[in-house]
C-alpha cells in the first residue's frame, strides 16, 4: 500500500496529465481518438475492443461486505486468506493494519473489516480475474493475433525494439489485466514495465518517468482506462 493510500498515488500519477471521466471509449469513433492523440494506451477488455468477434472471454469477479467492529484489533493482520470450503469468503481485510502498527492500532477503539467473495462474472459486473483454462487461452490468442494484424502492440514486445523506427507505425498499445488477459498485482506490473522504458527512453520521444507513472496505473482497473497523449 502506498504511503498515504492509493488516492494520493493516483493523484500523483495524473499530475500535469489532463484527465476526463465518464467517457465511454466505445461510444466514440476511433478516428475521434486519433484527432487528440498520436497513440493510445488502451487498458480495456481485448475482446470488447474487437466487438467480441470471436466470442466473449470469461472472468471472475469479487464482491465485498464491509462492517465496523467494536474492537481495536479484529484479526491482527491486514489480510487473512481463507481456502476452506467452510468459509464463503476468500479473504478478510482489516484496513487499519495497512498503515497503523504497534500501539497505534489501539488508539482507535473500532476497526473496519471487509470480507471478499469470489463469484462468477456476469455482464454489468466488474471483471477482476482472467480464467486460465484451455478455452480462454486459445480464445485470447486469437484476439492477440488480430491485434497484431491491426498493428497493435503489447508491453512485452517493446523489450526487443531498440529503435523507434522499428514500430513507428503502431498507434495503439494494449496493457493491463483486461487488455492482456493476464493477472497482475501492483508489484508485478511495475517490475515488468519499468525496464522497458529504461532500455531506451527515447522510444516515444517522451520522458520515461512519465511512462513510469502511466504504467503504474495498469493495476486495479475499473471498466477500462484510456490514456491519450500528444507525442
Give the role of each language-model region.
Residues 1-39:
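Helical element adjacent to the flavin cofactor pocket in flavoenzyme catalytic cores
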Residues 2-6, 33, 81-82, 182-189:
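Aromatic-acidic/polar surface patches that form glycan- and anion
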Amino acid at each position: 500500500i502506498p504511503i498515504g493510500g492509493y488516492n494520493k498515488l493516483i493523484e500523483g500519477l495524473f499530475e500535469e496529465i489532463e484527465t476526463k471521466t465518464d467517457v465511454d471509449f466505445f461510444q466514440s469513433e476511433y478516428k475521434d481518438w486519433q484527432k487528440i492523440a498520436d497513440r493510445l494506451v488502451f487498458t480495456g477488455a481485448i475482446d470488447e475492443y474487437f466487438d467480441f468477434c470471436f466470442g466473449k472471454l470469461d472472468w471472475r469477479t469479487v464482491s465485498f461486505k464491509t462492517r465496523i467492529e467494536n474492537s481495536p484489533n479484529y484479526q491482527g493482520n491486514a489480510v487473512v486468506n481463507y481456502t476452506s470450503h467452510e468459509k464463503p469468503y476468500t479473504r478478510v481485510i482489516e484496513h487499519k493494519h495497512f498503515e497503523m502498527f504497534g500501539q497505534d492500532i489501539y488508539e482507535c477503539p473500532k476497526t473496519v473489516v471487509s470480507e471478499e467473495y469470489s463469484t462468477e462474472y456476469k455482464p454489468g459486473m466488474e471483471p477482476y480475474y482472467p480464467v486460465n483454462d484451455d478455452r480462454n487461452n486459445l480464445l485470447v490468442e486469437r484476439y492477440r493475433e488480430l491485434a497484431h494484424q491491426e498493428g497493435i502492440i503489447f508491453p512485452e514486445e517493446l523489450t526487443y525494439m531498440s529503435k523507434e523506427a522499428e514500430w513507428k507505425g503502431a498507434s495503439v498499445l494494449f496493457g493491463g489485466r483486461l487488455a492482456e488477459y493476464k493477472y497482475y498485482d501492483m508489484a508485478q506490473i511495475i517490475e515488468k514495465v519499468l525496464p522497458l522504458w529504461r532500455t531506451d527512453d527515447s522510444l516515444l520521444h517522451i520522458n520515461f518517468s512519465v511512462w513510469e507513472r502511466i504504467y503504474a496505473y495498469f493495476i486495479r482497473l475499473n471498466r477500462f482506462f484510456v490514456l491519450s497523449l500528444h507525442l
